[in-house]
Each structure stands twice: as C-alpha cells, then as structure tokens.
Amino acid sequence: MGSSADTETAMIIATPASNHNNPATNGGDANQNHTSGAILALTNSESDASKKRRMGVLPLEVGTRVMCQWRDGKYHPVKVIERRKNYNGGHNDYEYYVHYTEFNRRLDEWIKLEQLDLDSVECALDEKVEDKVTSLKMTRHQKRKIDETHVEGHEELDAASLREHEEFTKVKNIATIELGKYEIETWYFSPFPPEYNDCVKLFFCEFCLSFMKRKEQLQRHMRKCDLKHPPGDEIYRSSTLSMFEVDGKKNKVYAQNLCYLAKLFLDHKTLYYDVDLFLFYILCECDDRGCHMVGYFSKEKHSEEAYNLACILTLPPYQRKGYGKFLIAFSYELSKKEGKVGTPERPLSDLGLVSYRGYWTRILLDILKKHKGNISIKELSDMTAIKAEDILSTLQSLELIQYRKGQHVICADPKVLDRHLKAAGRGGLDVDVSKMIWTPYKEQS
C-alpha cells in the first residue's frame, strides 16, 4: 500500500540522519557513509518505481483482482465488476464496484480508490461472468447467519440463464431503502422502472408499498394513504402477529411493488410480473400505529406439482427472530386445511434445502418420538401435509430408513432421534392454528 511504503521510506531516511549526529560515527569510516547514501538513493529509487508501478495500473480494468479494505478494517480479495468516472477528480479518478470473492454477492458495493491496495493488483482476467458466485472461507458464525437469513425465491436458474442473469444484474441499482422506521441496505439488483435508474435510495410506504424518489414525496403520500395494514383479508392474529392474504389479481399494484421490494433481497430468482396467478401471505408485527410487514411468502393459486410455497422472504431488520421458520410452518398449515400435501417450489438451493430439511426433521422426529407402534410414510404425510418424497429423503439423510423385504422401514431409536432433534435446532415461533380464519382459494366465476 502507498501509506506503508511511505512510512518505510521515512524510517530508512532517518537512519543515516541519526548516524550523522552521532559522535561515534560522525567522521568515521567513509565507506560507511557511502553505504548509507547508497541505501538512501536505492530506497528513493524503489519508492519512485513502486509509485510509478501503482499509478501505471490505473484506471483498473473490469475483471481486475485486488485487495480491498472492508468495513471490518481488514483487507479482503475483490474482483472489479464495474467502474465509473468521478468527474470531480483527476484523469484516473474512478469509483469501482467490487465483489468480495470470499463472501456472498449481496455484499458487493461501490468503493473508493483509497480502499484498494494497488500493490496487490493482479492482471484483469478475460472472463464475462463467473460460473458461480463463491462464498468461501466463511466462519461458522457467518455460515450460520447466512443459513438463518437465507431467502428462497421463484425459479432457480440454469447455468446459461445464471450467466445472463449475473451479467444483467451485476451492479446494484438501489443502495438503500427506507421502509417504516428502518433504513435498509439492499443486497441485489431489482428491475425497477427506467425512471428510477438514477436513484440510489428509494422511500417505501410500509402499508401500500408505493415507492418514491424523495423523502418529501413519501411524507406527502403518508398524509393521504388510508392503509394501516396490507390489503386483503386478515387470516391470522395471535398477540402482536398478524397474517394477511393478498390476491395478486385483486391487488395487482401492491403485489407488483412487493415483488420489486423482495427482489432487492433475492438473488438468482425470476421476478414474476404476472402476479394474478399468485396469493401472497404477508406477516406483520402490529402496534397502535398499524401492521408492519416483517416478511412474506407466495404460492400459486393452482399448482399441478403440489407446490405450497413459491417465494419466501424475511426482511433484514426482522431476521433471526424465527419468522422464516414461522412462514414455512404456516404454509404447511394452509396445506392441511386444503386437505393436500405440499412441497416448496423446485429446485431448492443448497441453503433453501437446509431450511426445509430442518423443518421436516423437527416435525417428523417429534412425531416418531411420541408415536407407539408402527407408522408408515403415508401416515406421516397425512399427518403433516409433507410430501412423501420429502419425508423419505429427510429420513434417509438421517439414516433412519432401512430397506427390508422390498419395503422401506423406519428405524427410530430414541437416543438417535434426540441427537438429530438437537442438531436441527429450535423450531421458531409456533403457529396457533386456533387463531387461523381461512378457507382455501376458489376461483370466482
């Protein structure tokens, strides 16, 4: 880095100066003075060469890899994704949009030149988009945090679509949003209408989800907005928690705005503009000011594959409170009331599978612990609304299934069940089914 090189030079320059003032060396060996002068000249030469080399790499090309100082004060490897000219600066004065290669893409950000260690620059690579966004070298705390805050969206993308998606969405267009009492840093690109291309921050009405460019616009809107909760029917109320069912066809603008908002925190997902086909279940914390959205899930009105959940999100300020687990559990309670088995939309990401595997493990093993006698996978499916294939894969992953005489047999030793239940973690908030007031969706003629 430039700063460390300057410090090192100052220290070396000071050395002959102190020798010159030392009576023991002042008039000593001429060779020693000559050597000191040579060190000084060499150091200055190296310093100039280093400075020229660092300046010679500017401006950095897209694809360049370099070390960058992050919020923790430490340097981490990054890849330059995009750059933009700082028109108030000099010829090589750019800001750079970087991806921290050790971390998830949601931490990508614009950084200034002084955050970069130019001595660590590696030549730009000729690559369009990485095949996968890496998430390497995570501590156990970071891994747990990502597991718990992971959000599952509409379709996962195949490899070709993934590359195209990453190229199109490589730079976050909105840096922050204001929603209710929170200012939230966004994670990913969201395809807002073109008139919002120049916005770094958006202001959302937390009740109708209309979004504006300026705070004053939001303040004027809030004086006129009559909503104090999401549109649609309140289908659940327990203490300060409420759930609202919103029909995408009846409340199209709200549903579309919800999708724009959600995409800021969802990666590698398809944003569905045809919201008519979906029902949205909005979870809220309620107080005397109204019902404040903390998260939601969506589901297709009619799914041939028996999907009971298409997209799920807990907003960042409300994560790690058990709301994600609550939303998953609620989707299965709806399936029970429909008299159907359900499963989340496929394919699941690795972390999405972790979330669901945890839910399935807790539900199934709790039943097996309490049940006396034999029980079949079909009976478990009927009791839980979990699809038989999900039950089988979960129990197989826990090594609780054996194949005997042409059929699968569940082997449930109590100590083994306790060990797996402990590993699955807490179940989060309970859904009090006695507080649900809901009837399955029927298309109106």
Swiss-Prot record:
Broadest EC class assigned to this enzyme: transferase
InterPro entries found in the cross-reference section: Acyl_CoA_acyltransferase, Chromo-like_dom_sf, Chromo/chromo_shadow_dom, HAT_MYST-type, MYST_HAT, Tudor-knot, WH-like_DNA-bd_sf, Zf-MYST
Gene3D superfamilies referenced in this protein's UniProt entry, alphabetically: 2.30.30.140, 3.40.630.30, N-acetyl transferase-like (3.30.60.60), Winged helix-like DNA-binding domain superfamily/Winged helix DNA-binding domain (1.10.10.10)
Coiled coil: none
Transferase is among the record's keywords: yes
CDD domains: CBD_MOF_like, NAT_SF
Domain Tudor-knot: start-end pairs: 60-118
Keyword Transmembrane on entry: no
Primary location: nucleus
Matching SUPFAM superfamilies: Acyl-CoA N-acyltransferases (Nat), Chromo domain-like
N6-acetyllysine sites (modified residues): K269
Post-translational modification (record): Autoacetylation at Lys-269 is required for proper function.
Induction of its expression: Up-regulated upon UV-B exposure.
Assembly description: Interacts with MRG1 and MRG2. Component of the NuA4 histone acetyltransferase complex.
Note: Knockdown expression of both HAM1 and HAM2 results in earlier flowering.
Protein name in UniProt: Histone acetyltransferase of the MYST family 1
Gene name of the encoded protein: HAM1
